[in-house]
Amino acid sequence: MNKIKVRLREHRHFFVHNDLANAAYYFNNRIAERLKNDDREGVALEMMACLTMIAFALEAKINFLGYKLIPKWDERAPYLTKVKMVTKQLGVAFDEQTRPYKTVRALKNFRDTLAPGKPIELQNDKEIITTHEELEKRGYLTADWQSQLNEQFVKDAFGDMEIIWRDLLNRSKLEIFDTLNGGGSTITFIEHIE
């Protein structure tokens, strides 16, 4: 087989926020459909996956904007520090007392609880007067983060991620096409090699 000499010019860019947001979108729609059909078996696991994807997608979107807008962007900076840097750069007041930015902290805390998955041991020893029904409602074996596995928080988190993303993207003056994965290549023939 004859060899040829060519010049390859290639460029690719991958922005993982798209994949994470697509996963969040998938889970969000699946959860809504399942709840509409009263199909609740294992839905909390899908809520956990959805909220995790939303938290990761939001951070990836912030990293994307930081990468595009802020010189020497540090994607390893703390989560909330990065959000504050990007919002400041784009002239947005970061108010974590109200939505949608209140949700950012809740998602960050949720994410941090699950990853890296630190063990928690709690002990309690006391006598109480209660009813059997009250004992069952205590949720003693329920972790704090599990309270966020509910339809309303999933809806709010997904909606707030979209609100934040659309607002920041609009303010950034970047086009939607700037956010997509892509690339290209050209091959230029130089000569035959014997």
Whereabouts are the PLM-identified features?
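Surface-exposed polar/charged interaction patches
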Residues: R30, R34-N37, K68, Q89, ...
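Charged alpha-helical initiation segments
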Residues: M1-M47, I193-E194
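Amphipathic, non-membrane alpha-helical segments in soluble helical-bundle scaffolds
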Residues: E10-A21, R40-L51, A55, Q97-V104, ...
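A contiguous binding-surface segment within folded domains or other stable secondary-structure elements
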Residues: D74-Q97, R105
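Charge-enriched, short contiguous segments at helix-coil
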Residues: F94-A106, F110-N181, F189, E194
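Short alpha-helical segments used as structural interaction elements across diverse proteins
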Residues: I4-R9, L58, Y79, R105-K108
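Amphipathic alpha-helices that form helix-helix packing interfaces
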Residues: A24-F27, I31, C50, A57-K61, ...
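Short, contiguous, well-structured surface segments enriched in hydrophobic/aromatic residues
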Residues: M48-M85
